[in-house]
Amino acid sequence: MTLQQYMMFIYKWNPNRETVIIDARTHKRVEWNDLPENMNRIVLHIYPNESTITLYLGDKMEVEHE
């Protein structure tokens, strides 16, 4: 899935939520403008009771174990 497809998916299902992008290796927030072109490893976290959507750059193992 491309970054644009992710953005469309997020907006379609959660138009009123803020999207937060976190680099799983550094645990720091990344802005949309600073994302690399090739986003082939994104883990999407949507929590029903929160007002934000979190995209983690990196695979699930990195997110869970760092």
Where are these regions (language model features)?
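N-terminal acidic leader/helix
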Residues: T2-D23
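Detector for the mature cores of small, proteolytically processed
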Residues: R17-E66
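Detector for methionine-enriched segments
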Residues: M1, M7-M8, M39, M61
